[in-house]
Amino acid sequence: MANRKRDAGREALEKKGWWRSHRWLVLRRLCQFFVLGMFLSGPWFGVWILHGNYSSSLLFDTVPLTDPLMTLQSLASGHLPATVALTGAVIITVLYALAGKRLFCSWVCPLNPITDLANWLRRRFDLNQSATIPRHIRYVLLVVILLGSALTGTLIWEWINPVSLMGRSLVMGFGSGALLILALFLFDLLVVEHGWCGHICPVGALYGVLGSKGVITVAATDRQKCNRCMDCFHVCPEPHVLRAPVLDEQSPVQVSSRDCMTCGRCVDVCSEDVFTITTRWSSGAKS
């Protein structure tokens, strides 16, 4: 029998203990705050590890790291980025293409803790979804952004990009960007479940495309143990990606959809240990 959304993870907590039912969540938060700390170490302590922001930065003032979407906007607008920016975009593209799927979204993005909190509160207080929007709208928005950059000759998305706004706000103090971040929080809390990360964000859409053939993946390797509690579906930002691997015994157990954020919450909250984070070449992930 399916559990209530507000009870998602309770069985896992009772059966596996706190650490094993929160392990991947804790590791993600540590990674997110570690990256943020590398940005903050310069302005706060004068030790520049990551110099810049989430759109473009230098690691130890040497290794460039550039958001691929910003680079595509620059190319679409007719402006060839500097060699260092192109190099940074290549580094990030290769890194996430090899690693897999939307690891940036769940392990690096500073907005992820905000949207996770909104959706935890939504489950906790049994708030019903008040609107429905198609998940493919993020890909439409991605195309619109590139067309808009081509037509205006500007990096049109960077005017309102909440990921870079969040990063700058944390480094330089919250200003008008805080209103946009608050709006996204309320949107996820009151309007559409997992609305930003699961439906709209064009940054996540691009990383999903780039990492669709990457190494790291989630697999329902022991799906025969599934008791249909549905906790994994309740906590997953992209629950549609679990449908075939978990419920269709004729489908491969590997979560192959590029929408998967590889966040590991399905692994955490499953009391029967159905899921594992593995590689796409693992024999268990292919079965």
Language-model features: locations:
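Non-ligating segments of multi-cofactor redox enzymes
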Residues: M1-V253, R258-M261, R265-S287
